[in-house]
């Protein structure tokens, strides 16, 4: 196809060349030119033919090379596929061999199982025969035993069960006692560690109890101005504050007496302002008392907020904050209740951290545990019950309310938090120096404790120990049984509660001792 095209092109070129040549030269030279053109055309045709042959050969060689290469690639692909097929065949062959082995093992196991089953059946039959034989022998032996012992089988079984039961109870009692002693020793040791750590890490201040306040005067002449004409000033001051003013021979001093420390503080501040101002008359007294009351209320609120801030306790109702501040002016057995509440809160927090419970909740319960003492002279009832009612009223959680209620056994403590508050309260109130009483009052209280204990029948002796926080009552084992000793302890506790006034709680410990004496001769 390519050769034909080339020849056609050459022929056309030759014809064109001849045409132009014929039109430009003389006719004479036309023959020569034609001849030359023909020769040139023939030469070009030969060159074209040779070139076409060359091209054809090259194309043929190229086509053959491509065919050879394609065939080689196809052969390689076939070879790879054959290899893959051989690998698959080997795998299949291995799987078949494995399956054959497994089938052989299964068949062997089935045969073994069949043999074992046959063996078990034979053994079962043998055991059944032996069991029947033993049963007959047992019946014979039982009949002989019943004949010899004079007891039936059920009676003998009952006797054996009773004996075993008594022995088991005895062993169990010994084991329980050992476990209880071990647990008690461990618990006591851990409790002492926690309590000692809590006490060591906190040392609070305390303020001695006072029912009077002393206001210094610049001179004794001021006493007359305080009394006023016909005593009108002193009457106005007492009426406005509810506090008694005692003006006696004490030089340059006026004594304010009253059981309510808040009102006493208002009276003290008012009197100091009046003395400093110099204007003392009923109208001015009422004005100054009103202003002093506002200042005391503000100081109470600030004291409550400071306590909550120092402990890191937040979200307390404003009314409870005020009640906490009022505890600053409340004391119990010479111990300031505000400082006591802070101390209990810190001790609760330390012990809670040691036990791994909520520290903030423990501090909150400790701070609020004596909340009722802020108003116990205004509301009837135990300060623990009053405090729990106030906490419940102002949105404290049930756990906090229960801890307040239970810290003096008005409610049985049923949570770790309640027990912590109870322990911290006892630690704060009972530590040396926290509370003070007159020596006569102290001795009288101990005498009263022992007198109440010895008033019961069967008591041989009694001892008031632990600074009056425990009474040990020794009773005669001939006149008082174990059950009666429990009742006696409860009766003594009730009589102490009815006849005595005391801080914290008193442990009544009734001890009954039985001695067995025998002589070896």
From Swiss-Prot:
Enzyme Commission number(s): 3.1.-.-
Domain of life: Bacteria
Membrane topology per record: Single-pass membrane protein
Gene Ontology CC: plasma membrane
Residue ranges of domain HD in the record: 337-430
Coiled coil: none
Membrane-crossing segments per the record: 3-23
Domain named KH: residues: 211-271
InterPro entries, alphabetized: HD/PDEase_dom, HD_domain, HDIG_dom, KH_dom, KH_dom_type_1, KH_dom_type_1_sf, Ribonuclease_Y, RNase_Y_N
GO molecular function: RNA binding; RNA endonuclease activity
Cellular localization per UniProt: Cell membrane
SMART domains: HDc, KH
Record-linked Gene3D superfamilies: Hypothetical protein af1432
One of the protein's GO biological processes: mRNA catabolic process
Task of the protein: Endoribonuclease that initiates mRNA decay.
Membership in a protein family: Belongs to the RNase Y family.
Protein name per UniProt: Ribonuclease Y
